[in-house]
């Protein structure tokens, strides 16, 4: 079957009236480009397809010129699949590969918090499944407005319930993430989701539709009207001043049970080698899946093309129009390419699992994507024009007008009053550990099943989530996500590098070697030159940092238009890092569990409070420069942490970041159930020592018998270290400053979120 380049049938269904391309998010130039590409006016269905595929969400038209530099990050021997696929894949040894990726579902989660978050999890899980992997874990970096704001009370409980409800039903442990509160996210919550999966190295799947005559099979749920316009309206437009999109589409509705059996069906299809190509249906639904698989097939150099009959698509609503069927973002659907010989077996296997499977088309050699509806051709397009050859913009950049002023407003002692006496330091500590961004996340994480599948070794509140891949050998992985919008507001280049450095520190503190990076870049409108300058700086910072650390960027996501009216969110790059264990039994937790262990501070502390939690919590101040980043020192610190864990020299390790040494000590004491006696250097400023947020630091607990061996290693490698105390008792005692009991710390640390959002029953 071949398509007709002139496509007279498609032309015949185009209405004579002016087409509403601007309402669909297309510019005059883009509409003219479509006409030039087709040699005619597009049909309604074609116009809808171009509008979603050329949206910011699908085409990356404003970000692509900056993302290209990630391809220059190191291509390590472990990297099997890099940028451009549904998710990156790395070889972890023992015949296994791991795939991981982070995505956003920000705008839908504001409109419908439960379903927006739930389908965000479902979508990233299918991305991992599409690569051929069994999903084994989820992380959820979340950001909301002020903790006590009425809108946060509406959004946060629904988001948490949606993530927990969907992930728990799938049997996926939620092993990590973040919860951050800041007024910048009022009306623009960030709901990012990372999923990781594992597979045999020889089971990596491709999305390419190849093999003339092969069947195109739709698997999973029926198609309805939910989510129509999601990528072009929710994901590619700014909220108006009223807190919602001017054009409100329906948010997708998730069904985790259908997703679960779809996962098992696909994994069996992969194991039995019954598919030649596979693609999930996420943003832009069938439009995206059909165009990307067809374009990928043609890109292989083999004869390609596709003909599809929309009348064969199982519908939930019989009255749907062709463009609605193509644009629907109904969840729990996959598109498979199957040989005619394998088709009966595929259909029988799906029936056995209770999964709807329908042949809707055929791979052709036409070089075009042709779609029929009620006997007429409603789409006849070159698929590359939708999937690969859309508009690319090099938008203007302008450094924010207040950039220098904000950075000059440093939180110096002359600018912001600092605690000096022991009682003042004690009060500051209690206030910080109870603050929304530093308090316990148990109210959130207790709603997630962190240990289902029995593969979880460490989970929140640990520095990284750790999963066992092999019970026989102990092979395992660690994952962490980090981001700090305040740092990035002060300096998007340095702020992004700080997020990368912290995520690497987190997986190294757990005992694993960082091996790969993913990212979710959350920004305001790309039409704002100041936002685009921030974005360009963030991309450059991440690319340079990865080159310095020797880590590949395997893929990620860009989420633009996170703003209300003309006010964007702080630039918020969220960085995910994958770490590798030879043996997860050597992992290092954060808790101080052994009385008498020596506490050693690794790294150097400076007076660095720009963008700090202390400055915000005590003074509502955001200004100055963020902490400095030294990647050579970060890499050395990571190597020391991994060696100490591997060689049995550490009983606990915790990276230092928000809240500084004081926050890390509180978290480790409460996690392990033991107190600590701390001695600060003579002549030092206790406030700086306790609350500075200098990067490149960690606190470790070392058995006395291992102290000399560990410190000798630090000396030989050139890593600064200092003995700061000992694990002891049931108080946190800072010599000559203050003492506070663990019970008082626990009450302050654990009481905040239940007081704000209600106690869990």
UniProtKB/Swiss-Prot annotation:
Catalytic residue positions: 57, 105 (proton acceptor)
Binding-site residues, Mg(2+) 2: 127, 280
Main location: cytoplasm
GO cellular-component term (any): cytoplasm
Protein's cellular compartments: Cytoplasm
Disulfide bond positions: none
Binding site for Mg(2+) 1: 103, 557
Database matches in Pfam families: AIRS (PF00586), AIRS_C (PF02769), FGAR-AT_linker (PF18072)
Pathway: Purine metabolism; IMP biosynthesis via de novo pathway; 5-amino-1-(5-phospho-D-ribosyl)imidazole from N(2)-formyl-N(1)-(5-phospho-D-ribosyl)glycinamide: step 1/2
Stored CDD domains: PurL_repeat1 (cd02203), PurL_repeat2 (cd02204)
Family classification: Belongs to the FGAMS family.
Protein name: Phosphoribosylformylglycinamidine synthase subunit PurL
């Amino acid at each position: 079957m071949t398509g007709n380049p002139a496509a007279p049938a498609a032309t015949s269904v185009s209405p004579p009236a002016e087409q509403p391309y601007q309402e669909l998010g297309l510019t005059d130039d883009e509409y003219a480009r479509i006409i030039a590409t087709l040699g005619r006016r597009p049909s309604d269905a074609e116009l809808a397809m171009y509008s979603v595929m050329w949206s910011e969400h699908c085409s990356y038209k404003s970000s692509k010129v900056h993302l290209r530099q990630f391809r220059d990050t190191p291509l390590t021997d472990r990297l099997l699949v890099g940028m451009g696929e549904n998710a990156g894949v790395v070889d972890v040894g023992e015949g296994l590969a791991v795939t991981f990726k982070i995505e956003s579902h920000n705008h839908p989660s504001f409109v419908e918090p439960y379903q927006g978050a739930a389908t965000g999890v479902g979508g990233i899980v299918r991305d991992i499944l599409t690569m051929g992997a069994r999903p084994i874990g989820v992380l959820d970096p979340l950001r909301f407005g002020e903790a006590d704001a009425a809108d946060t009370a509406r959004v946060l409980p629904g988001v948490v319930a949606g993530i927990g409800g969907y992930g728990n039903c799938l049997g996926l442990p939620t092993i990590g993430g973040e919860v951050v509160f800041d007024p910048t996210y009022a009306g623009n919550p960030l709901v990012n989701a990372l999923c990781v999966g594992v597979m045999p190295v020889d089971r990596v799947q491709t999305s390419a539709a190849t093999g003339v005559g092969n069947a195109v099979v739709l698997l999973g749920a029926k198609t309805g009207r939910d989510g129509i316009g999601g990528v072009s309206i929710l994901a590619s437009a700014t909220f108006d001043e009223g807190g919602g999109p001017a054009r409100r589409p329906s948010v997708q509705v998730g069904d985790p049970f259908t997703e679960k059996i779809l996962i098992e069906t696909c994994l069996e299809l992969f194991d039995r080698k019954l598919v030649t190509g596979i693609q999930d249906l996420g943003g832009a639904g069938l439009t995206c899946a059909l165009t990307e698989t067809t374009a990928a097939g043609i890109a292989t150099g083999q004869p390609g093309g596709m003909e599809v009959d929309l009348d064969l698509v199982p519908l939930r609503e019989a009255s749907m129009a062709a463009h609605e069927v193509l644009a629907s973002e109904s969840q729990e659907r996959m598109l498979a390419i199957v040989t005619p010989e394998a088709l009966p077996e595929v259909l029988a296997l799906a029936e056995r699992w209770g999964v709807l499977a329908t042949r809707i088309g055929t791979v052709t050699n036409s070089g075009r994507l042709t779609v029929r509806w009620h006997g007429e051709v409603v789409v006849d397009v070159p698929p590359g024009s939708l999937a690969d050859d859309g508009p690319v913009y090099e938008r203007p950049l302008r450094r924010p007008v207040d950039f220098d002023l904000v950075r000059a407003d440093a939180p110096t002692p002359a600018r912001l009053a600092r605690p000096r006496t022991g009682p003042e330091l004690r009060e500051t500590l209690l206030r910080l550990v109870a603050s929304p961004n530093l308090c316990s996340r148990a109210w959130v994480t207790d709603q997630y099943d962190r240990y289902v599948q029995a593969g979880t070794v460490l989970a929140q509140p640990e520095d990284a989530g750790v999963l066992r891949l092999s019970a026989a050998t102990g092979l395992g992985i660690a994952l962490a996500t980090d981001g700090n919008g305040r740092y990035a507001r002060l300096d998007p280049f340095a702020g992004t590098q700080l997020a990368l450095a912290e995520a690497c520190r987190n997986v190294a503190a757990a005992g694993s070697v960082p091996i790969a990076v993913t990212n979710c870049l959350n920004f305001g409108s790309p039409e704002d030159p100041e936002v685009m300058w921030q974005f360009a700086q963030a991309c450059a910072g991440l690319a340079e940092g990865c080159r310095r650390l020797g880590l590949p960027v395997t893929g990620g996501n860009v989420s633009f238009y996170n703003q209300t009216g003309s006010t964007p969110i702080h630039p918020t790059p969220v960085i995910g890092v994958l770490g590798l264990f030879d043996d997860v039994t050597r992992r290092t937790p954060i808790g101080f569990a052994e009385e008498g262990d020596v506490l050693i501070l690794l790294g150097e502390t400076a007076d660095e409070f720009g963008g700090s939690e202390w400055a915000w919590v005590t003074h509502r101040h955001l200004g100055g420069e963020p902490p400095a980043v030294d990647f050579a020192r970060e890499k050395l610190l990571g190597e020391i942490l991994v060696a100490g864990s591997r060689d049995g020299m550490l009983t606990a390790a915790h990276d230092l970041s928000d809240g500084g040494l004081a926050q890390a000590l509180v978290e480790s004491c409460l996690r392990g159930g033991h107190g600590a006696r701390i001695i600060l250097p003579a002549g030092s400023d206790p406030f700086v020592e306790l609350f500075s947020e200098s990067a490149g630091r960690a606190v470790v607990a070392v058995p006395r018998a291992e102290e000399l061996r560990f410190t000798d290693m630090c000396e030989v490698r050139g890593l600064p270290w200092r003995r700061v105390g000992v694990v002891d008792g049931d108080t946190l005692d800072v010599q000559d400053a203050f003492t506070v009991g663990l019970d008082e710390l626990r009450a302050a640390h654990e009481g905040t979120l239940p007081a704000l959002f209600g106690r869990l029953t």
